[in-house]
Amino acid sequence: VTLDLQCGSALESITAAAAKIESGLADLVIAGGFESSSTQPVRMWNSNHPDYQEGKSYTVAKFIPDIQGEQVMLEGAEKTALTENVTKADMDPWVLLSHKRAAQAAKEGILSDIQFSIADSKKDEGIRPSMSQRLLDRLPCLLPGGSIITAANACLMHDGAAFVVLCSEAYRKKHGLTPQAAFRFGTAIGSDPFLS
């Protein structure tokens, strides 16, 4: 089954899997999600559609009103930072600390037992061990007229996937499995993307 709840798709698939197990319709379900920015389709409206413009394409699926453009997540991040009085200077130390911790975790192989390689690579290309304040100071803001969101403190465009195996207590006992976690409750709540 494929669920599309945009950013919440993986959580929703796990919640649906748990509900299926709880209802007795399944004993074991693999659930999760993936995103592949490198294979993201480029779309165009058909020439008979009112939104058609010669040579204009879009990549963000039109699940959202037209007032929200291709950069709605960046715009939302910028607006939220401004609303909450968070400056780029406030964010920079967290950016540096995050990359430092991620690089250390990668070096120590903390996640190596739950990562697998694709094309002989396990490297997380989002980690920048050489990130410095000097580099952060040089990065331009991503939005015209923006003052906060840069390539260093924004979400990455990436390819990635994560899945979990959920099972009933009866299945777990029958097969002698040791759980790593227990699912208690899940919910999805939508909000204004401009306040991401």
Predicted region positions:
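Acyl-CoA/ACP chain-elongation machinery
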Residues: G33-P41, A119, I189-L195
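A short small-residue
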Residues: L74-T83, R184-A188
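Conserved catalytic cysteine-centered active-site region
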Residues: V1-D27, I67-V72, S130-L156
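Structural motif
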Residues: D27-V29, S147, F163-V164, Q180-A182
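N-terminal extracellular/periplasmic Venus flytrap/periplasmic-binding protein-like
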Residues: D90-K174
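Glycine- and Gly-Pro-enriched alpha-helical subdomains that act as flexible
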Residues: E169-S196
